[in-house]
Regions:
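Transmembrane helical segments that form the transport core of multi-pass membrane transport proteins
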Residues: 239-351
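Structural signature of hydrophobic alpha-helical transmembrane segments
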Residues: 1-13, 62-75, 134-139, 264-276, ...
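C-terminal transmembrane helix pair
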Residues: 309-312, 317-319, 329, 333-443
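Intrinsically disordered, low-complexity non-transmembrane regions of multi-pass membrane transporters
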Residues: 1, 189-234, 285-291, 443-454
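Juxtamembrane helix-boundary/capping and inter-helix hinge elements in multi-pass membrane proteins
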Residues: 30, 83-98, 125-132, 154-166, ...
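Alpha-helical membrane segments and immediately flanking helix-loop junctions
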Residues: 120, 127-163, 186, 203-208, ...
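Hydrophobic transmembrane alpha-helices of secondary-active transporters
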Residues: 14, 41-48, 62-95, 274-284, ...
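Entry/N-cap segments of selected transmembrane alpha helices
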Residues: 65-66, 86-118, 175, 236-240, ...
Length: 454
C-alpha cells in the first residue's frame, strides 16, 4: 500500500510541475504539450535516475506498470458509463463517412505497423539479442495507447516473452511525444496555408494551459444523490468499483474458453471492464435509475484517469531493463512514426468531406497516442468544434472492431500457436482487405485539400 501511495504522490508532484512548466516555458506553450506528457518525461528521468544511483524511494517501475493496467480498465469503464453525445450540428451521413474512413485507416495502421515492426526487428534486432516478436508490440502502443500496450504486453509476458509490457510502454511513451512533436507543426502549417477553415485565434488560456478566475466557466454538474446520504462523486466511483469486480468475474468466465483464446481474453481486463459497464448501465436503464449517472461528472473522471495514465505509463519505463534494446526500439518507433504520418496524411485528404484536414490531424494524433491526443490536435484548428471531427473520433471506435482478426493473429503468434511467418502473411492479407474496404466504401477518393498556399 505504501508503495502505491508513494507512486501516486510522485506522479501527482510530476503533474503539478508539468502544469507549471507548460505555463512558463514558451516552447511547451507553443507546442501545446499536455502537462501529463511533460510530467511523464520528468517522471521517467527521475525514476531511472533513482534506480541508477540505487536510491530507495519506496516504489518502482513495476508498481507504475500495475497502476497503468488498473487505470486503463477504470478509464474504459468510465467511458462506457458515460452517455452518448447529442451533437446535432453535422449531418449523420457526414459523421458516418468520417468515422468509417478514419476507423478503417486506423485498422490499416493496426495491421501495417506490426508487420513493419517485425521486419525492422528481424533485420536489426539480432545484434541486440531482441526477438522479432517484440516488434509486433508497437500497434498496441501507437494506435491504442499506453493502457493497451501494458495490457497486451502483460499477456505476451504470460506466454514467456519477458519485459514485453515494458517494451510496449516505451513505444507508447515515444508515440505520445511524436503525436505532438509532428502533429502541432502540421496543424500550424495547415493554418498558415489556409487549409484550416474553422480556425480562430488560439487564445492565451489554451497556450498556458490554465484559466484565470475571470476566464473560468461553470459546468452544469448536477447532484444525483443527496449529499447528506452519499456524495454524487462517491456514487460514481462506487459504480466504477462495482463494474471492476464484475469485470473480474467476466474474466473468470473468459478463461474457460479453449486454447490461447481463454488466457488472452481473460487477460484483456479493459474489454471485460467495457462489457461490465455496458451490462450495469443496461440494468440501470431497465430499472429506470440511470438518471443517477451524471455524464459531465463521469467524463471528468475519465479525464482524470487519462492524465494519470499517461504520467504513470512514462514512469513505468525502466531503462535498466530495456536499455540493451533501446536502439532497435527507437529506430522502429521513428520509422513507424514516418509511416503513420504518410498513411494518415495520404488517406486523410481523400475521405471526401469538408473537414478532411481536421480528420487527418485527429487520426494522426489518435494513431500515435490516444483519442484525447487526437482531439487535442483537432482543437488547434477547430477550437470551437464547429466540425463533427471530435464526434467522429469517438464513433470510429465501433469501426475499430474490424481489427479483431489482427489482434487474434498477434496473440496466437505470442502464444506460439502460429509462427511469425504465418502471422506476417495474415497481416499482409489484412492490409489488402482494409484497402479494398476503403475503396468500396468510397472513403478513398480524390484529395479534398492541398498543402499549396491559397
Amino acid at each position: 500500500m505504501n508503495s502505491f501511495m508513494i507512486a501516486f504522490g510522485l506522479a501527482s508532484i510530476a503533474l503539478c510541475i508539468g502544469a507549471f512548466l507548460r505555463a512558463k516555458i514558451p516552447f511547451l506553450r507553443n507546442m501545446l504539450v499536455p502537462a501529463s506528457v511533460i510530467a511523464g518525461l520528468l517522471g521517467v528521468i527521475f525514476m531511472n535516475a533513482m534506480s541508477h544511483f540505487q536510491i530507495n524511494i519506496g516504489t518502482d517501475t513495476e508498481m507504475y506498470g500495475n497502476i497503468v493496467n488498473h487505470l486503463f480498465t477504470i478509464s474504459f469503464i468510465s467511458i462506457c458509463l458515460t452517455g452518448a453525445s447529442d451533437n446535432k450540428d453535422n449531418t449523420a451521413k457526414n459523421i458516418f463517412k468520417g468515422a468509417l474512413g478514419m476507423g478503417t485507416v486506423w485498422c490499416l495502421l493496426y495491421t501495417i505497423t506490426p508487420l513493419v515492426g517485425m521486419i525492422i526487428i528481424a533485420l536489426i534486432g539480432g545484434g541486440f539479442n531482441m526477438e522479432t516478436i517484440y516488434g509486433s508490440l508497437i500497434p498496441y502502443a501507437f494506435t491504442q495507447g499506453p493502457g493497451q500496450a501494458a495490457a497486451y504486453g502483460t499477456i505476451y509476458e504470460s506466454y514467456g516473452w519477458e519485459n514485453a509490457a515494458m517494451v510496449g510502454m516505451t513505444f507508447a511513451a515515444i508515440g505520445f511525444v511524436m503525436a505532438f512533436l509532428v502533429g502541432v507543426p502540421a496543424a500550424k502549417l495547415g493554418i498558415s496555408r489556409g487549409v484550416a477553415k474553422n480556425c480562430g485565434k488560439i487564445d492565451n488560456s489554451i497556450l498556458k494551459g490554465y484559466l484565470k478566475k475571470e476566464e473560468q466557466t461553470n459546468y452544469m454538474v448536477k447532484d444525483t444523490t443527496c449529499n447528506s446520504n452519499m456524495e454524487t462523486l462517491t456514487f460514481h466511483f462506487a459504480l466504477i468499483g462495482l463494474c471492476y469486480v464484475f469485470a473480474l468475474g467476466i474474466a473468470k468466465v473468459m478463461s474457460l474458453l479453449p486454447g490461447f483464446l481463454g488466457s488472452s481474453m481473460s487477460g484483456l481486463m479493459f474489454m471485460n471492464g467495457m462489457y461490465a459497464a455496458y451490462i450495469v448501465k443496461f440494468i440501470m436503464k431497465k430499472l429506470k435509475i440511470d438518471f443517477l449517472i451524471e455524464d459531465t461528472l463521469q467524463s471528468k473522471i475519465t479525464g482524470w484517469t487519462a492524465d494519470y495514465l499517461v504520467v504513470c505509463a512514462f514512469m513505468a519505463v525502466g531503462f535498466n531493463i530495456i536499455g540493451q534494446w533501446i536502439v532497435p526500439i527507437v529506430v522502429e518507433a521513428l520509422i513507424v512514426t514516418a509511416i503513420t504520418f504518410c498513411v494518415c496524411f495520404y488517406f486523410g485528404r481523400r475521405f471526401g468531406g469538408s473537414n478532411d484536414f481536421e480528420r487527418t490531424l485527429g487520426l494522426y494524433g489518435t494513431s500515435t497516442g490516444t483519442v484525447p491526443s487526437g482531439i487535442a490536435l483537432v482543437r488547434i484548428v477547430d477550437p470551437e468544434f464547429k466540425t463533427s471531427t471530435a464526434v467522429e473520433l469517438g464513433l470510429m471506435n465501433l469501426v475499430m472492431m474490424l481489427s479483431t482478426p489482427v489482434y487474434i493473429a498477434l496473440l496466437a503468434m505470442a502464444s506460439k500457436t502460429i509462427s511469425v511467418q504465418v502471422t506476417m502473411a495474415i497481416l499482409a492479407a489484412m492490409t489488402v482487405v482494409y484497402m479494398i474496404v476503403l475503396k468500396v466504401t468510397r472513403c478513398w477518393r480524390k484529395p479534398t485539400f492541398s498543402w499549396k498556399k491559397d
